[in-house]
Amino acid sequence: SSPVNFSFRNLELSPNVSTASTPTIADGSMLEKQMLSAHAVAQMQDPVKIWMDRAMMDSKRVLYLNMGSIFFYNREDYDNIVASLEMLHEQVPDILVLWKIGNHPQSVQPIPTLEECNLPSYIRREHWIADVETVLSHPALAAFMHHGGGNSYNEALAHGVPQFCISQWVDTHDIGLYIQHSGVGLWAEKSPKFDPSDMVPKLVRLLKDDYKRFRHSALSWKLKCIQAGGTIGTVDIIENLLKSYDFPDNNSKARIPDAL
């Protein structure tokens, strides 16, 4: 097997280095230009982006709240989060909230529908976020509150966004610990419960009292992501590992005894 190529680690840091998941235009082909143009038009028409643009113009900051696509809210969790956000607003009034809650039947998610919820004006509820990267890269974004999912954690790291984790299951508890120990954010002590007495002080600390420190730490980890190669570097590692492995009889499906 051939050695893994880590040459991408020698890339030069510059404002043009991107850690975004959007493909980089290398050859300037017409198709790629059309795709980029279509993406730009879609962003201009994105109501969430327009709302975040307005927030920035009004000197407001945004807390993005997304507990993941496989998380279902029960009524107690929902009410506790609403209560926590109301208490947060009293102490940090410049914070707006973008809250993504998937549409699910009442039988599995017994909470008010989008039409019924009657939330305060500083909370915007969406059933779907068309472009997460647009949200995470927006200058109005102050922090990302999530369940500790691997995607949420790494995307926030790559964009230099402070994080607040209320971990829910298995590996998400580990990620909550990573967030706290790395200095990029805070982890709810009473996870997986949504306890206002636990949530509100931490959100105030994250978004107000120690915000600059958490932001600085998050940006330093963004730089580390760039230095490690970013998205392109990650793909290179995976491809090189696959290429360096010899599959017997060109079959990647090993027999069970061999796999163990």
List each model region and its residues.
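Catalytic core of nucleotide-sugar-dependent glycosyltransferases
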Residues: 1-260
